[in-house]
Design a protein with these regions (language model features):
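Accessory cap/linker subdomain of secreted extracellular hydrolases
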Residues: 70-71, 79, 145-243
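Cap/lid segment of the alpha/beta-hydrolase catalytic domain
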Residues: 44-119, 168-169, 443, 455-456, ...
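Short beta-strand/loop motif that positions the catalytic acidic residue
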Residues: 244, 250-252
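C-terminal, loop-rich substrate-recognition/catalytic regions characterized by aromatic stacking residues
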Residues: 5-9, 278, 292-565
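Glycine-rich nucleophile elbow surrounding the catalytic serine of serine-hydrolase chemistry
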Residues: 132-142
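Alpha/beta-hydrolase fold nucleophile elbow
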Residues: 122-134
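Active-site-adjacent alpha-helix of alpha/beta-hydrolase-fold enzymes
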Residues: 260-275
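N-terminal cap/lid segment of alpha/beta-hydrolase-fold proteins
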Residues: 7-49, 418, 422-424
């Protein structure tokens, strides 16, 4: 904000509304998809008033388990002068067709056609936004890539720019296990649900049978496609970040798996009208109720964003910090923490101005600013079941998965490198990187690195994780086995998850190196050893993006607590 400006609150509720169930939206191949609409009604003093509309398109059945939540949110938005459109993706819910896979090209074109159809309705002011959490956030980004003329703004929450690098299928070239299986099974069940009989008509059973016979299990393609290529580029914004031109407001969470994409979009989407990112501690759920807190009134922020870009209200949105994050402190590890301690911080760019790399060298169980004096090697025998002290999914965090516990049981089966107790706080914002010199006796090996803070009692609390299938060390499109003969080491660079954290004086920083992360990733099917080399000839190290206390930052926005909706 400029020094003399104050942010304007979101639109207040002043409209009655009507609901239109099962509105049919025509798309270019002749299908008519099913949508539910919550429409604000013009006030008596402005009978010709028209309204912007916010579209959410997902395959989770708007007329079944999502209906109550949609109704609550639709009423709330309509009262504030926004129409809400909930569209069933083709082949799901009450929409006809077949859902052959997630994020197909025809599905994205359906989104484009729906945006333009909505903009042409007599009750619409011609301005359309999209929003969604997870799948709905993905589709918002994917449709925005096509640049529909009337799509002004999108709000993706916990979404990705790169389906290969950051989704439930592949991580660091490793095939995921728990999360891919959970999602594949749940989506198989949802795709098998019948269309809503009241909307589908008397032949709903026949349509249901056709859907059951024609819809494949999506898992088959995910298992088959283990290297990057055209399959994963479909639906990915990367590498064409300039395709995103509308205004963007992103929501992400440190405890979720989609935090890296938010920071990449913030950094690389230079053609967008504006890009703004909000990162809390949260798992894969709404900031009003997700753990760990603190929580906030995310709907108020949603309405302020859409007020600016769908209603053209000059509320100061574009003058507020581009990135706001919760810098969290040490918390004793637990699966379902109510909140993490810390503070909100803000900056105008990412990478955050003033951030400097801080290098910590691996030694004989040590992590130090100075390189080790002698060369040495640590040998880790591969154990496929190591990993269960961490979170049981890459980022969903829902019951019964939860977040990471005390990491020490896993660390017994790896190599650990630990600093002396810190004398000063150390604030990190950005992407930590482990640079390791390794050899292996396995042609297929996984390297898992965990960054943690160690309390005085020895408890090791997770800060961030990075993984690499070492066959992908040179390429995600053309993997190559690790050499198992000879003495030459290979330098591998393993980025950890983007992190906003403050290490506290008196505690220690630890880097642990493991060979598996079960049940999150499928382990290497081979037996053998991974060796980590360190010393003058093989300078393995951890590089942290440190924000000095003297670095200039901005005043974070003053968020509201969440009201009942």
């Amino acid at each position: 904000m400029t020094p003399d400006a104050q942010p304007i609150p979101a639109s207040e509720p002043r409209h009655a509304h009507e609901v239109r169930w099962d509105v049919r939206v025509p798309v270019r191949d002749g299908l008519e998809l099913s949508a539910n609409l919550w429409l604000p009604l013009p006030s008596s003093d402005a009978p010709d008033e028209t309204f912007p509309v916010i579209l959410e398109m997902i395959p989770y059945g708007k007329d079944s388990w999502r209906r109550n939540a949609d109704t609550s949110r639709g009423r709330w938005l309509a009262a504030r002068g926004f129409a809400l459109c909930r569209l069933d993706v083709r082949g799901t819910g009450s929409s006809p067709g077949v859902a052959l896979d997630e994020y197909t090209e025809v599905e994205t074109l359906d989104g484009y056609d729906t945006v333009e159809w909505l903009a042409a309705q007599p009750w619409c002011n011609g301005n359309v936004g999209m929003w969604g959490i997870s799948y709905g956030g993905f589709t918002a980004i994917q449709v925005a890539r096509l640049r529909p003329p009337h799509l002004r703004a999108i709000l993706p929450m916990y979404a990705t720019d790169d389906r290969y690098r950051d989704d439930v299928h592949i991580r660091g070239g490793c095939v995921t296990a728990s999360e891919k299986s959970q999602y594949a099974v749940s989506q198989l069940g949802m795709n098998a649900m019948p269309p809503y009989p009241a909307f589908a008509g008397p032949d709903w059973r026949d349509r249901w049978r056709e859907r059951l016979e024609a819809t494949p299990p999506w898992l088959m393609a995910w298992v088959r496609e283990q290297t990057d290529g055209p399959y994963w580029r479909r639906g990915s914004l990367a590498p064409d970040y300039d395709a995103l031109e509308c205004a963007v407001f992103q929501v992400a969470g440190w405890a979720d798996s989609y935090v890296d994409p938010a920071f990449r979009i913030q950094e690389r989407c230079r053609s967008a009208v504006s890009v703004r990112t909000l990162v809390g501690n949260w798992v894969h759920s709404f900031p009003s109720d997700a753990y760990p807190g603190p929580n906030l009134d995310w709907l108020h922020e949603l309405v302020r964003f859409f007020d600016r870009y769908l209603k053209d209200i000059p509320n100061g949105w574009e003058h507020e910090p581009a990135i706001t994050w919760f810098e969290h402190d040490y918390a004793a590890p637990e699966a379902f923490p109510a909140a993490w301690p810390g503070r909100w911080r803000a900056a105008g760019t990412f990478p955050v101005a003033g951030t400097t790399p801080s290098t910590w060298h691996l030694g004989d169980g040590t992590l130090a600013p100075e390189p080790a004096a002698t060369d040495a090697v640590d040998t880790i025998r591969h154990r496929a079941t190591t990993g269960t002290s961490g979170a049981l999914s890459w980022g969903a965090g829902w019951h019964p998965n939860g977040l990471a516990r005390d990491l020490r049981p896993d660390e017994l089966h790896g190599a650990t490198y630990t600093t002396e107790p810190l004398a000063e706080p150390l604030a990190v914002i950005g992407v930590p990187e482990a640079v390791l010199h390794v050899t292996a006796s396995m042609a297929v090996a996984t390297c898992v690195v965990r960054l943690s803070e160690v309390d005085a009692d020895g408890t090791s609390s997770l800060v961030a994780t990075g993984v690499l299938n070492l066959t992908h060390r040179l390429s995600d499109t053309d993997p190559s086995p690790m050499p198992t003969r000879g003495l030459a080491t290979e330098e591998v660079r393993i980025p950890l998850r983007t992190t906003g954290y403050r290490f506290t004086p008196g505690r220690r920083i630890r880097l642990a190196v493991l060979t598996s992360y079960w049940p999150v990733l499928w382990p290497s099917p081979m037996t053998g050893e991974l060796r980590v080399h360190h010393g003058p000839a093989t300078p393995s190290r951890l590089v942290l993006p440190v924000l000095p206390a003297s670095a200039p930052t901005l005043e974070p926005p003053a968020f509201r607590l969440d009201p009942p909706v």
